Amino acid sequence: METAGDKKWSAEEPKEEVELQMSSQPSTAPAKAKATGKKQKKSETDNGCKPKEGKPQDTETPGQTRRKVPIPPIPEYLPPVNLIHRDVLRAWCQKKRVSSKGQKLDAYKRLLARAFPEQMLELRNVPDSAKDARLKTAHKKMKTEPGEESEVTVPLEMVPVPEEQIPALIDPPMLYEEVSTTVVTTPATEAVLASWARIASNAKKYEAVPADASSSSEVKGEMWCVVHGTSLPGNSRGWVRLQFHAGQAWVPDKKGKAIALFLLPACTFPPPHLEDNMLCPKCVHKNKILTKSLEG
């Protein structure tokens, strides 16, 4: 026989099992709510009631509104069609009671025929459509050959200037007087090369004269020193005529010897009556000292 304690235990056991089952199973309350929401949406779509969608015009900002074009009065001369706005052309057609339907060019032609009949001749060169415009441009390209230019060159005309506009010269400068001296400004390297070339070209004229002819006999007058670039008295002995061999200037020495010239010539031109390939005694002495210092 069952005791009272056994009955209590048996009665509490199913309660605990039910609580364990409830805790182990997830809650289905939100799922049911979602399911009911889906069913409501389906029922609305089934009944044919669609949710209202906002129009894009309602969401436009005030800055996106179309700007109105100011309409000027109708001019006496109608400008070309490409310079007229479509809204302006439509307003002019309404004022003249002309139909503005169709393309812009058609409305332009109707307005010309009604209000500007004298300008109808200008429409001969206007193409009726874009296709006609392409055909006209292709026809022009075929006329002009690839090597020719379509532009026309107009010769310049010599317009005589009136005498009143020509300013009179009062005491004009003496531009045509003979000048005894000339000043030439050239870079140092170019000037040195030019002076060497000038000396070498003039040295060929005096090849028949011996190199020490001027040093053996006293020369009266003045002589031009290549290094100094000035005329010096030629009464003293020691003047030497330079020699050129293999593109180098040589200073003749005793016993048929020659020393290379290390001094740079001046960048000035001598007068036409003086030689420009002579070296003064001081420069000869300086050149000897320079060669000895280089050798030592």
Swiss-Prot record:
GO molecular function, one term: chromatin binding
Disruption phenotype: The mortality of mutant animals is increased at birth and most die within 3 days. The few surviving neonates show growth retardation, but they catch up with wild-type mice by 20 weeks of age.
Membrane-spanning parts: none
Any one of the GO BP annotations: lung-associated mesenchyme development
A GO CC annotation given for this chain: nucleoplasm
Protein's UniProt keywords contain Transcription: yes
InterPro entries linked: Dppa2/4, Dppa2/4_C_dom
Region (Disordered): 1-73
Entry comment describing in which tissues the protein is expressed: Expressed in pluripotent embryonic cells, but not in differentiated somatic tissues.
Chief subcellular location: nucleus
Start-end of Basic and acidic residues biased regions: 1-13, 42-58
Record keywords, A-Z: Developmental protein, Nucleus, Transcription, Transcription regulation
Feature: compositional bias, Low complexity: 23-34
Record's subcellular location: Nucleus
Purpose of the protein: May be involved in the maintenance of active epigenetic status of target genes. May inhibit differentiation of embryonic stem (ES) cells into a primitive ectoderm lineage.
Quaternary structure annotation from Swiss-Prot or TrEMBL: Interacts with DPPA2. Interacts with PCGF1.
UniProt-listed PANTHER family: DCR DOMAIN-CONTAINING PROTEIN, DEVELOPMENTAL PLURIPOTENCY-ASSOCIATED PROTEIN 4
Protein name according to UniProt: Developmental pluripotency-associated protein 4
